[in-house]
Every structure is written in structure tokens, then in C-alpha cells.
């Protein structure tokens, strides 16, 4: 590594450590920011000599990255951005902090995938899903798929592990059609993780025709784009690998969606040569992920934290939550996106019949949505008020990003 890069890496580690010591955060952003100011090519230098996996998508990135890092860890030390800092500053900080490791598994914000592909030259890229998220400032889903596709076409040597159930992901992972409009066979390993949210993939990104669905299958009514046959699938409480062998998966994380994330992790690890029978044992070591799914006992209540930041992830959170009193917390600060109209894309009907409490900066926006959805609720001013308002036992907490962080801080829980 050049001298400038060595100095930048050292300063990055020092800045991150000082940030942690001063209680100003985990240092996962500031360290990388300073390092890249000293050497703009620092991420590329730190990536050299490592076998790297990138994990990107709208939802499930952090959990899948943690599961994948655990699975790849069978082979040796793995650098990873476990705090969820998923932009180049976070990647730089994570690699600088880890030092020399043979492997790295990095969560990548979907908007930065092309840039990080160029800098890191990964061995494999995992594409999870694409759906609407922070539309007041983020790109439309179809535009995001176009960016992914353009980036991947420039890196034909990179292995791709992609979700066969998401038409946008399949199109992005598939090479452009040839001159006679047939879609070229993709050089991709496909997994099936399901797709609960369909509202962003009814129109074919290739020709503009309608996407048709029947059971697990989907296809375009106007061109050859259709669901590919997945090599990795979820079956009951396990995962079926490309040989047809079934592996029981014992996770400490709730919800069927995390079984799909586990299938993705096993597929990515297999690209590094990890046998599923070895990798599956490591998946059960993952508990909470950057506070997600954490359970905290407070005043006789067992409080479980679930993060939901867009319509698709709210539906998944409802699936994970027990039939118990539930607190919903909504903010609209810069990291959340300022537009809360997406609340009307979420069907809150699954919450009927349980005690529902609401709080957060934009609790009244949420109140209007629940009123329209005929879901009774109680407004509380603080998280502490919510805890006192429910009987002893389980309290499910579903919150968007900054609301989630506020509640974590109140619980003094920093992972």
C-alpha cells in the first residue's frame, strides 16, 4: 500500500477511536471520511488483496450482511461494516479498522453500488430487492434498477447472487437483450427469498408491459423476462441448496424474511467455497443486528425492537411481531426522508385487535393513517409513557430509522 494510503488508514483508525472515546458515535463514518480526504483512493487500496462480497438492496442489507459475514467466517477473519454505515466512508472505516483480513463482507447502500463496485472489485455481489424508499429524495425503483444493470455490465467478471422473486432485481442482474430482443442467459446464482411487496414491480422494466403473477411465478406479458429457476430456496424451516440437499436453519432472529436472508447468506458463502453444512451452523450465532430484533427487559416488560423504514419493511415487521401490545414510532428527519405520504402505502390492518400506541415526531400523520385504516390507537408522548401504558409482558416496538435510534438511546443499548 502506498505511503499516503498507509497514513490515511492510520489517521482513519485514530479518528474513529477518538469518536468512540468521546461518546460521539461508533466512528464508522468520521474515520472513513477523514481517510478519504487524505487519500481519495483509500477504499481501493484497502480492498486490494481481499476477497470481497457486497450486499445491496432496499431492505434486509444489514441483517444479510451480518449473516453472510458469519458464514464466510468459516474460512478466516472477515472485515465487515457491522454498524450499518453503508456508504464509502463506512466501508473505508470498516476495512481500516479491521486491518489485514483475507475476506470482507460489506453492506452497500443501493445508490452507491456502482461506485463501490469500481473501488473494491468484489468477488461476488448479492442483490436482495428493490422497492420504494424515501421518494422525496431517492431515485424511482426503475431508475435504481437501471443504475445497477449499467454497473454490473461493466463488471462481467463479478459473480452475482440475486433474488429470483423480484422482477426489478432479475432485470438488473440480467445482461441487456441482444439484437433479436431475446434476453441473454444470465450468469447469475439465483435464490428465492420471496417478495411480499409487489407494488413496485407490476410494470416490466424491459418493455413496459404488465408483470403477471401466479403463485411463486411471475412473467412479463410482452417480452421474455420471467422468473428464473432459483438454485437456493427456502423450504419449511430450512434451505435447499443447488444439489437438492436440505439444511435446517436455526436462527435467533424472528420472521420468515430472515430465513430468506439466511438463504442469501448461504448462497454468497458458497461462492467463496464454504459448504452449506459448515456455514449453516454459524448463522445461529447472530442475535440482534445493530439493535434490530434486540430484546430488553424494562419495568416488567420484555421490549423487542423492530426497524421498519418503508412500506415493504413495515409489512415484514408485522409478520415478525407477536400478537402483543405494539408501539409504532414515526419521525421524518433527514435520514428518514421528510415525506410521510408512504404511510398510506402500508396496510395496518394486521394490528387490529391488539393494543396499539403511537409516538414520534410525526405521530399525528400516523394517527390519520390508522384512523383511515380503522385501527384503534392511543397516542403517548414518550417511550417511557408507552412502557407504563401496557401491562407486564411483551411490548413490540416498530419504528423508522431515527425513531428507532432514539428508543435505542433511551434504553441505553448501543451495539
Question: What feature does the model see in each segment?
Answer:
Residues 1-32, 48, 208, 220-227, ...:
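ATP-dependent carboxylate-amine ligase
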Residues 3-190, 202:
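Phosphate-binding loop of NTP-binding sites
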Residues 4, 186, 190-311:
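Adenine nucleotide phosphate-binding catalytic loops in nucleotide-utilizing enzymes
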Residues 65-69, 266, 367, 408:
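A generic structural signal for short, well-ordered alpha-helical segments in conserved domains
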Residues 68, 72, 91-95, 262-272, ...:
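Buried hydrophobic packing segments
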Residues 83-86, 129-133, 193-196, 331-334, ...:
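Short, acidic/turn-prone active-site loops that include or flank metal/cofactor-
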Residues 95, 141-142, 200-211, 389-396:
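Short, surface-exposed amphipathic charged segments that create phosphate/polyanion-binding patches used
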Residues 107, 128, 161, 261, ...:
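Residue-level signal for inorganic ion chemistry
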